Amino acid sequence: DRIERAFGVKRADAEQLAGDPVTAAFFEEAAAGLSGKAAQTVANLVVNELAAYLKASGVALGESGIAPAQVASLAKLLASDAISSNQAHEGFEAMAASGDDPEKIVDERGMRQVSDAGALQPIVDEVLAACADQAQQYRDGNHKVIGFLVGQCMKASRGKGNPKLFNELLRASLS
């Protein structure tokens, strides 16, 4: 209850975090000074990525070598849309294996998402030209096809484009 109020994270996550004093202390250190989306992102990383890593490796949190500051850094990258959730997963695994800072991992591996509309619009235009049938389906009311078009944009950008921004640009171009 205290974690939920203090950091604004979802109740289920707060309960899971509070269930273990070591995990709760780790979360609180990682989320210090954060609230809202960034704090929830830390909670998600601790509850999902960290818990899965600890279970798979059979290592206790205190012996994992993963620091709260590393999780906070990864959470900030994810919350700011600098990386996608898939890239956060990849970054977490690399961080756990190497002990490197997530910023360094993201930069060395070229994982940072492109979130510049000016850079992504030409890709959107190419995809819409190549997928004229799907574009027409969208205009005719089949809005589910947007997922396919976002996927084509992601493929064309080799995973570097921000999918949320592609979605917005596609919808704007198709309206």
Feature-to-residue mapping (PLM):
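Charged, compositionally biased, marginally structured helical/coil segments
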Residues: 1-175
